[in-house]
């Protein structure tokens, strides 16, 4: 039984790729057709590959993997944070700081500073400091929380990284590749799939599409951690007979 049904993918607009002039030819095998200057992703492949991604993440979680969710574009930021938290994992949903993985020691020092500032406030140290200094500390904390809050409690560099839009998150993907960290990603028609270990061909620009895929991978983590079938919403709907028929009946725009 598929983790995500064709109907769910269609309703979320997962099939809408980029304009044909913006495509990456390496994504050709995941493209079904072209309509009105837009590439249409082959959802039959997305269904199959989403299953594989689910199994990969579930099995990693079952082995106590640390999983980092990455999505810094506005369409992804909320879903990435919410689903990572729900799965008890970690996230980066604002700008990726160069060296987050490859210079983990330095990042840990910045996280330690964030925790120190929080501790100062909790212990009442702020009350003893001049208002100007407190304002500067609050500003520093806000900035550190924005960029590092999602990995504040991450015990080590991740064992697996899930990425929304590897085209935008090229630096993150390169760092993971350098360290041998497998990458699971939503890959749109403009991206290079070569550096992605587990590909999910999908529209990564629509909020609903990002939420759908990301939530399913969070379900995979939860199931893996529980060591048994989690209470996840497996797709019950029958698959459509023909993707060509589906393309004809679905209308909508790429962006949610």
Swiss-Prot record:
HAMAP family: Ribosomal_uS2_B
CDD domains, per database record: RPS2
GO CC term (a single one): cytosolic small ribosomal subunit
Protein name: Small ribosomal subunit protein uS2
Classification via InterPro entries: Ribosomal_uS2, Ribosomal_uS2_bac/mit/plastid, Ribosomal_uS2_CS, Ribosomal_uS2_flav_dom_sf
Encoding gene per record: rpsB
PROSITE patterns the UniProt entry points to: RIBOSOMAL_S2_1
Family assignment from sequence similarity: Belongs to the universal ribosomal protein uS2 family.
Organism: Streptococcus agalactiae serotype Ia (strain ATCC 27591 / A909 / CDC SS700)
UniProt keyword terms in alphabetical order: Ribonucleoprotein, Ribosomal protein
Gene Ontology biological process terms, A to Z: translation
Pfam families per the UniProt record, alphabetical: Ribosomal_S2
Signal sequence residues: none
GO molecular function terms noted in the UniProt entry: structural constituent of ribosome
